[in-house]
């Protein structure tokens, strides 16, 4: 069972929607081959409200298979855009999002939240602090399904260290702005299987560690790594240097909203 904390940050995809004269739904996302995860959400929206068809274009800024929640962010962004275009209430959009993924409703609302159970129990919490991070990843990605499968296998073999941290304590540390406590609590059980599936993750961790972040952890099931810094200046300097070394790295800040109009 999960016990995790989620936070919205200023790493984003850009989504545009337009009406069609027919009933077709067309999604274009140059960065992703095959069916986009936002398509089922778009179909559910159309079925729920009996709308015309629409064209959707997604420009990825959130890397794929990084554990940064890009798929759920696209579901949320598409539903938000369609809701605006067809003037539908936020509650209805949240209901559709919940049918598409456990964290999709959170992505729609944004801010901070603790997720437990299988990820379906999401409890938002207020956090007045703004955190400065670097979101980085190696060139490869990690499949969430493969990471969880390997975790179960390694857990049975006793190869996963016991983790006593819990999301409630992480939430308290975030509210207080206690970076020392946060550093001690930010443990990801999927880190071991993720690094076994993609050893390059450890190299990105090492590079981030050279800039002395207050906190460093693998995001989700990887391959992305997040580092928390005391100041925006430190985060920006780290991101610039990693970019020079050919690593995807972005300086980001925590946000109180999940989706924004631009």
Q: Locations of the language-model features?
A:
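Conserved, helical-rich catalytic subdomain that frames metal- and/or nucleotide-binding sites
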Residues: 109, 120-215, 230-243, 251-262
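Active-site glycine-rich loop that binds ribose-phosphate moieties when present
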Residues: 95, 99-100, 114-124
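Conserved glycine-rich beta-strand-loop-beta hairpin in the small C-terminal domain of fold type I
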Residues: 223-225
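ATP-binding N-lobe of GHMP and related small-molecule kinases
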Residues: 1-66, 84-90, 127-133, 137-140
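DPxDG-like acidic metal-binding loop motif
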Residues: 66-97, 106-110
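Residue-level signal for inorganic ion chemistry
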Residues: 15-17, 38, 71, 136, ...
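Phosphate-handling active-site elements
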Residues: 47-57, 81-99, 231-244
